[in-house]
């Protein structure tokens, strides 16, 4: 067995009455843990290689804490706490970044993103949806939907209320980790698996999906859909939209470059280069016909928006007299044609 792992984490989670995992919380996930640490934990867990989620007991947690005292003080301290747990424990060891095969593995990779250990598209999430059970997220934690009605009745009979915040496959990120240096006005609008860079502010209308996020700093008042990554210094205006890779965006990875502004209620279905501006209310899809204007506001040619994907210093606007979508640049007609030719 190799002592090299892609990732390792010790977690505490929730299971339904059949013992199936509903969710897992990893306080201190590790990316590329040291060979010494792997060698210390493998015999205690009976790990012999591959990608595995191994349930372990409180007694094993204490053993692991002892084994790691001289190797990794932070992990040893965590395991000392886990040894006192009244909830089920699991160690997830990933030898490689491969397609997912269990719920604890899926939760570990979502944690890696939200802990900023990997960036969106930096880890394989293939097969994630069937492994994330649809769960009632309540003020008493994750509840299996088949067990919810009974628990609601039990709570009422005690004079209590079991409040259901959402019914979803993904929990909110802040119940698992709050990254340093961020503001999130409505935490329910950021899913676990979002990457929120330092200096990011997400206002009430902002939303960030899993495997998506921001480099930071930046202001998010619109929707950052699955797979979308927003560069530093960019501003997404109120109610604006970025087309995700899950619905409508196909396999095109939509990216927002640095220093961009997407106006209120605008939207993009193409990747933006640096310092692009999209006028409020204008939605650009890949097939949108665009009048390309040069530095003198002269028409150079009519192109599809996808031909302008990734180009820098563009202003997308709608002509209020004739409704045509225009792209204004600071370049000459010759420079524009060269840029388009290079892009193709």
From Swiss-Prot:
Q: Which InterPro entries match?
A: DapD_gammaproteobac (IPR019876), Hexapep (IPR001451), THDPS_M (IPR032784), THDPS_M_sf (IPR038361), Trimer_LpxA-like_sf (IPR011004), Type2_DapD (IPR026586)
Subcellular location, record wording:
Cytoplasm
| Gene3D superfamilies reported in the protein's UniProt record | 3.30.70.2010, Hexapeptide repeat proteins, Trimeric LpxA-like enzymes
Binding of succinyl-CoA occurs at 223, 238, 241, 264, 279-280, 287, 304, 317-320
The enzyme's main class, written as a single word, is transferase
Sites where the protein binds Mg(2+)? 205
The catalytic site is made up of: 221 (acyl-anhydride intermediate)
Could you say which EC number(s) this protein's record lists? 2.3.1.117
Q: In which pathway does this enzyme or protein participate?
A: Amino-acid biosynthesis; L-lysine biosynthesis via DAP pathway; LL-2,6-diaminopimelate from (S)-tetrahydrodipicolinate (succinylase route): step 1/3
Q: What is its main location?
A: cytoplasm
Q: Which GO terms describe its biological process?
A: diaminopimelate biosynthetic process; lysine biosynthetic process via diaminopimelate
On assembly, the entry states: Homotrimer.
The cross-references to HAMAP family, in alphabetical order and at most eight, read: DapD_type2 (MF_02122)
Q: What is the name of this protein?
A: 2,3,4,5-tetrahydropyridine-2,6-dicarboxylate N-succinyltransferase
- According to its UniProt entry, this protein's organism is Pseudomonas putida (strain ATCC 47054 / DSM 6125 / CFBP 8728 / NCIMB 11950 / KT2440)
């Amino acid at each position: 067995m190799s002592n090299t792992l892609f990732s390792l984490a010790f977690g505490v989670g929730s299971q339904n009455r059949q013992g199936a995992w509903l969710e897992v919380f990893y306080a201190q996930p590790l990316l590329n843990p040291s060979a010494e640490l792997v060698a210390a934990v493998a015999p205690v867990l009976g790990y012999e290689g591959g990608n595995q989620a191994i349930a372990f007991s409180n007694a094993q947690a204490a053993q692991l804490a002892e084994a790691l005292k001289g190797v990794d003080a932070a992990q040893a301290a965590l395991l000392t706490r886990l040894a006192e747990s009244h909830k089920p424990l699991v160690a997830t060891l990933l030898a490689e970044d491969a397609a997912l095969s269990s719920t604890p593995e899926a939760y570990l990779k979502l944690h890696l993103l939200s802990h900023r250990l990997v960036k969106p598209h930096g880890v394989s999430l293939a097969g994630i949806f069937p492994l994330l059970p649809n769960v009632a997220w309540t003020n008493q934690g994750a509840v299996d939907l088949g067990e919810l009605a009974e628990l609601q009745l039990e709570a009422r009979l005690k004079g209590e209320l079991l409040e259901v915040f959402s019914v979803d496959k993904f929990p909110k990120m802040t119940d698992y980790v709050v990254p340093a240096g961020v503001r999130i006005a409505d935490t329910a609008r950021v899913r676990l698996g979002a990457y929120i860079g330092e200096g990011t502010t997400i206002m009430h209308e902002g939303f960030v999906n899993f495997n998506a996020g921001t480099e930071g700093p930046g202001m998010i008042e619109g929707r950052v859909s699955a797979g979308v990554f927003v560069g530093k210094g960019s501003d997404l205006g109120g109610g604006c939209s970025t087309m995700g890779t899950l619905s409508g965006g196909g396999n095109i990875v939509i990216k927002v470059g640095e220093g961009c502004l997407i106006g209120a209620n605008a939207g993009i279905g193409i990747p933006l280069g640096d310092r692009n501006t999209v006028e409020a209310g204008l939605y650009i899809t890949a097939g949108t016909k665009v009048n390309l204007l040069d530095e003198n506001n002269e028409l150079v040619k009519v192109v599809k928006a996808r031909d302008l994907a990734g180009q820098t210093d563009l202003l997308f606007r709608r002509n209020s007299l004739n409704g045509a979508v225009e792209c204004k640049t600071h370049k000459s007609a010759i420079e524009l044609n060269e840029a388009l030719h290079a892009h193709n």
